[in-house]
């Protein structure tokens, strides 16, 4: 009983980012979509208002109103923070909490940055196999692990998801299975979970998780809104 795993992220100022929360597909379903060219046209100070407006009255996780009310101040705070400094802060945080995690058997499962590249100049540090491996080596306690989100890491087609699964085997505590479809450089839609509907080989990903000894929790992630 109780909490034995925490999925969290270390993305400063705001969480995941999309340019469209309800892109209409030919079959009438809607999906979350990202287009860097559209993001580049948005004033960072107003992105919270635009995201919440698109949410049609719902409060989006990672875009909570109390946090977004301070977005200008947060941007100012992180304006001079480098990726190296953010990484050092993450390592410091994890080292400080590991004794408590050991006492209560809590696995920490960091979620990759979404998308897997810097947005509005903010540092992003959990976005590739190299960066994930770097963190796991810096804090080698097996309770320090990751949430393997195929859609977040897979947003960058240069990320080899199968390779990453084997590179960090034993440290994947949570898996988010999400398919995406590429439409060009830093441009993608979220897709249904069938491999044929997107750009990710979901069957191969699940097989790699099984073959690498994964015994954590899997959650089907996002997909389409069909009603």
What is each PLM-predicted segment?
Residues 1-145:
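Active-site acidic/histidine proton-transfer and metal-coordination neighborhood
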Residues 1-4, 72-76, 91-95, 99-103, ...:
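Histidine-acidic metal/acid-base catalytic patches
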């Amino acid at each position: 009983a109780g909490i034995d795993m925490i999925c969290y992220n270390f993305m400063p100022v705001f969480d995941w980012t999309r340019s469209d929360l309800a892109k209409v597909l030919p079959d009438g379903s809607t999906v979350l979509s990202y287009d860097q060219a559209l993001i580049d046209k948005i004033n960072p100070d107003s992105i919270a208002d635009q995201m919440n407006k698109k949410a049609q009255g719902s409060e989006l996780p990672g875009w909570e109103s109390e946090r977004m009310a301070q977005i200008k101040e947060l941007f100012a705070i992180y304006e001079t923070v480098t990726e190296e400094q953010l990484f050092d802060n993450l390592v410091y945080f994890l080292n400080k909490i590991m004794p408590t995690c050991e006492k209560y058997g809590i696995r920490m499962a960091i979620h990759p940055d979404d998308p897997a590249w810097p947005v509005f100049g903010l540092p992003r540090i959990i976005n590739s196999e190299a960066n994930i491996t770097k963190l796991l080596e810096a804090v080698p306690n097996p309770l320090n692990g990751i949430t393997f989100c195929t859609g977040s890491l897979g947003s960058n087609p240069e990320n080899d998801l199968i390779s990453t699964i084997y590179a960090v085997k034993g440290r994947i505590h949570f898996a988010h299975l999400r398919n995406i479809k590429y439409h060009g450089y830093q441009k993608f839609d979220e897709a249904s979970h069938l491999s044929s509907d997107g750009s990710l080989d979901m069957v191969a990903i699940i097989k790699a998780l099984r073959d690498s000894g994964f015994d954590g929790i899997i959650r089907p992630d996002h997909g389409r809104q069909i009603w």
